[in-house]
C-alpha cells in the first residue's frame, strides 16, 4: 500500500509540474536588450517601435513614452498595428522580469518575419529601477486592498460564503486549471466587461502570482466594487492544494 501511495504522490507531483510548465516555464529564446541600451537608442533617435504587452488598463496606467499597447493575448487580432517594414527594430516589454507575455509576443513577431526583435530585460520594473521615465494616460489611484490566503479562501468556499471568484488570467491559463466556480475575464478585457460583475458580492481576484490583481482591484474599487485578492495568486492556490492532498505514509507493521 505504501508503494501505491508513493506512486500516486509522484504522479500527482508530475501532473502539478506539467500544469505549471506553460505559465512558469523557462523564458522562450528571444534576444534581450537592457534598459540602458534601450535608453541609448532612444536618445540617438533610433527608429525603434516599443510595444507594451500588458492590458489596456495597465498600458494607460504606466508605460514607457511612445509605446504601442498590444496585449499579448490579442496579438493575432492586432497584427495590422505592427510596422510593414520587417526590418524595423521591435522591443517588447511587460510588467515584470517574470512575465512571459513579452517573450511570447516577440517570438510571434519573429515568426511573422520581423528580423530585429528583442525583449526589454527586467520589463517595466527594470526600466523604472534604472531611473528612466514612464508616462500615464489614466493613472489609477492606489488604495489598500486586502488579500486572502488560499487556506482561508478554501474555507470560505466550503462554508458557502457569498463571494464572486474573478480569474483575470488569460483564457489559455484558465483552461489549464481554475478554481471551481471562478469566472474568467482576462485583464485585457476587464475595462470592457467589468459591468458584468455583481455589485452585491465581494469579488475575489485571481491572477498568476498575486501581482497584477492589485491594480485590477484598485480599478474595480474605483468603479464601486468590493474587492479582495487571492494572496500569491493561482500559484499559491495550487501549492496549497498540493499540500492538502499530501497524506502522511502509514506506519510499517
Labelled PLM ranges:
Residues 2-6, 19-36, 44, 48-49, ...:
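Rhodanese-like catalytic fold shared by cysteine-dependent sulfurtransferases
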Residues 12-13, 23:
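Cleavable N-terminal signal peptides
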Residues 54, 169:
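Anionic group-transfer/hydrolysis microenvironments
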Amino acid at each position: 500500500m505504501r508503494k501505491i501511495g508513493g506512486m500516486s504522490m509522484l504522479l500527482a507531483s508530475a501532473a502539478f509540474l506539467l500544469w505549471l510548465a506553460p505559465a512558469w516555464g523557462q523564458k522562450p529564446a528571444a534576444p534581450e536588450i537592457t534598459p540602458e541600451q534601450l535608453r541609448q537608442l532612444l536618445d540617438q533617435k533610433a527608429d525603434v517601435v516599443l510595444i507594451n504587452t500588458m492590458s489596456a488598463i495597465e498600458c494607460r496606467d504606466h508605460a514607457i513614452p511612445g509605446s504601442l499597447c498590444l496585449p499579448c493575448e490579442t496579438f493575432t487580432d492586432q497584427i495590422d498595428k505592427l510596422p510593414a517594414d520587417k526590418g524595423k527594430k521591435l522591443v517588447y516589454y511587460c510588467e515584470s522580469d517574470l512575465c512571459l507575455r513579452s517573450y511570447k509576443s516577440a517570438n510571434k513577431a519573429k515568426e511573422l518575419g520581423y528580423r530585429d526583435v528583442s525583449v526589454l530585460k527586467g520589463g517595466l520594473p527594470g526600466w523604472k529601477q534604472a531611473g528612466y521615465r514612464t508616462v500615464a494616460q489614466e493613472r489609477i489611484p492606489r488604495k489598500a486592498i486586502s488579500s486572502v490566503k488560499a487556506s482561508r479562501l478554501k474555507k470560505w468556499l466550503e462554508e458557502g460564503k457569498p463571494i464572486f471568484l474573478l480569474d483575470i488570467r488569460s483564457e489559455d491559463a484558465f483552461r489549464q486549471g481554475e478554481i471551481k466556480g471562478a469566472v474568467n475575464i482576462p485583464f485585457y478585457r476587464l475595462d470592457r466587461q467589468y459591468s458584468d460583475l455583481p455589485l452585491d458580492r465581494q469579488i475575489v481576484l485571481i491572477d498568476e502570482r498575486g501581482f497584477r490583481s492589485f491594480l485590477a482591484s484598485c480599478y474595480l474599487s474605483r468603479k464601486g466594487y468590493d474587492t479582495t485578492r487571492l494572496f500569491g495568486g493561482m500559484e499559491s492556490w495550487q501549492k496549497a492544494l498540493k499540500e492538502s492532498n499530501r497524506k502522511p505514509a502509514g506506519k510499517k507493521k
